[in-house]
């Protein structure tokens, strides 16, 4: 899964996938979440495998101020509509055991006592608190920490932080999904981490705005600088690269991953106004 998803806020202008050695068979499919998956088969022996994906896309950023929530969902708690709930249930379902209710208690700390809790304020506070109170530590081993382990260690990768926030908001009744993709980091001085590798964050379903991005690693609300590649209910369903091989265990020496996200030359790729950006006017009418 390396091909970015097509959507109103990101449109593919060009995409190329190079695999060396050349596979004997290459086919594409959409998985159950609509992610683009390339399946490559090989019929010859090789000492190495290189997969290179190059993409140019048009990105329409959405900021926190452009997230508009339906009136009934602006305060927490709320209940999803009867039309949406059947399709959201699996995204609300908890994935990790929490016998001591550590995740539950941590999530509940963001709910105001004795006053109204705004939905966006709650989710924003949770995302920004992870960026502020937890330490980002790169880890190249596969898999994620459990949310409880991340809470206790107060450190982890972008995947760990995403899983923690997903489990926490699900404990509050929100529908949430795991996102794998890339983050645009033009300057390290801007404090954005997760560049140079695949990145992970969260999508939460909010009535009135649909699936909204929350990046707890960087405290980003909205899709600014975030390029979606795969969306799934669980991280294991959104692996960028997976497969099987035949050989001696000692033959596998490791894997290197490099991601480079840069701004395209506007002269070669002029804006098409395809990206849909939310806007609001003071006075408007329609029939």
Which residues does each PLM region occupy?
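Generic beta-strand structural signal
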Residues: 47-51, 124, 200
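Beta-strand-rich, non-transmembrane domain signature
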Residues: 1-33, 237-247, 267-286
């Amino acid at each position: 899964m390396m091909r970015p998803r097509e959507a109103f806020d990101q449109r593919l202008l060009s995409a190329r996938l190079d695999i060396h050695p050349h596979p004997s068979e290459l086919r594409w499919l959409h998985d159950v979440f609509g992610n683009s998956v390339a399946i490559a088969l090989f019929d010859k022996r090789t000492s190495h495998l290189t997969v290179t994906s190059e993409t140019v896309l048009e990105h329409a950023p959405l900021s926190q101020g452009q997230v508009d929530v339906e009136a009934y969902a602006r305060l927490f708690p709320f209940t999803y509509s009867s039309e949406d709930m059947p399709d959201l249930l699996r995204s609300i379902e908890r994935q990790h055991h929490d016998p001591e209710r550590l995740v539950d208690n941590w999530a509940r700390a963001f709910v105001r006592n004795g006053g109204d809790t705004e939905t966006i304020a709650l989710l924003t506070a949770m995302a920004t608190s992870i960026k502020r109170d937890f330490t980002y530590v790169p880890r190249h081993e596969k898999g994620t920490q459990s949310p409880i382990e991340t809470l206790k260690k107060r450190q982890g990768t972008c995947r760990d932080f995403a899983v923690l926030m997903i489990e926490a908001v699900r404990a509050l009744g929100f529908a949430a999904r795991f996102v794998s993709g890339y983050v645009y980091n033009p300057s390290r001085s801007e404090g954005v981490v997760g560049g140079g590798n695949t990145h992970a964050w969260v999508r939460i379903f909010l009535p009135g705005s649909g699936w909204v991005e929350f990046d707890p690693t960087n405290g980003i609300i909205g899709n600014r600088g975030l390029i979606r590649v795969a969306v799934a209910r669980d991280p294991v369903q959104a692996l960028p690269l997976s497969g099987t091989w035949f050989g001696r265990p000692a033959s596998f020496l490791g894997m290197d991953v490099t991601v480079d996200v840069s701004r395209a030359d506007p002269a070669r790729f002029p804006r098409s106004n395809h990206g849909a950006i939310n806007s609001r006017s003071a006075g408007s009418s329609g029939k």
